[in-house]
Amino acid sequence: MWLLAEHQVLTTGQIASLEFSSRRRAQDRLARLRSLGVLFAFRDSYMFGGTSEARYALGYIGARMIAAARAVTPPTAKAHMQRLERLAFLPTLTHQLGVNGFFCGLAAHSNPTRTDDGGAGRLTQWWPERRSAEFFWTNQGTDGGEARVRPDGYGCWESGGRAVRFFLEYDTGTESLRVLARKIAAYSAFYTDRFGVLLFSLHSARREQAFRAGLVKFLGGHDPGVVIATTARDLPGADDPAGEVWTLWSGRDHGPVTRLTLANLPERGPRVSHHAPELPYGEAAFQPGDKAIMPLLAAAPAPPREPAWWDSPSGLTPRRSA
């Protein structure tokens, strides 16, 4: 229930990958919770027949239980039903399910019934877009202005003594590559390198290749000051984001492509001692007002840099120093 309270919606397969030994066992348990009103389920109907996989959200009883645990006023039955209706018809629902699927692919390595993990690692922080924005968006950037960083998610992957923190940008192919690339401007203006690497999960290898080539043109040789890695979701083994599916961006779009595991990407961000998590997959999450974390968000003089392409109002040609 806590995962649904935090991440709003998960599919049958995603829930099964986290806690159950089989999809069938998950379906039986979910059906029982749905009958009790703890969970709510819905599906998409396809134009030419058939339906989507079941999507689950908190039912009214589940919402009341979460409210009681948090010592807050529970929603009314009408208000909760309206929320579920909005969720079911959310224009970005496919995107949200994709983001949650990415993190579930990592969190599944901690499934106690999984015996073929091989010690790949575990997810120790999983923040959704809302929580990430609350923490990162409103803080000052490197130039003293507001840093408009709004990742689709933020996480920490730990394996073999390494802790790779990351911001996730999840691409469904609906945005132009220029819009996607422009997001790097916000990360460049923020203290991104103090908190993690920047991951782009592209929906196809062809789009990944075009995106990487576009970065060379858009950045114009400028170092954004951010470690960037990309992957494509149609690659072999891409259903496991912890696997050898990541390629670091080096400023060039040619040469052999080397795929790395998530654990072998550069480590960025603070080391946080594990603690009793407020939410699942939060052992290494930042604590409010943490004295070791807050100084990382303090404004500092921006180091001199060459103009980047995003400095131009048109976003096409970078300004040049006199």
Regions found by a protein language model. Give the residues of each.
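Nuclease-adjacent, charged terminal/linker segments that flank catalytic cores
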Residues: 1-87, 294-322
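Short, charged/polar micro-motifs that form catalytic or ligand-binding hotspots
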Residues: 5, 16-19, 23, 88-92, ...
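Short secondary-structure capping/junction motifs at helix and strand boundaries
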Residues: 41, 110-118
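Leucine-rich, amphipathic alpha-helical/linker segments
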Residues: 76-108
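Active-site metal-binding core of divalent-cation-utilizing nuclease and nuclease-like domains
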Residues: 89-96, 104, 115-166, 172-179
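Non-catalytic C-terminal interaction segments of nucleic acid-processing enzymes
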Residues: 174, 178, 182, 191-322
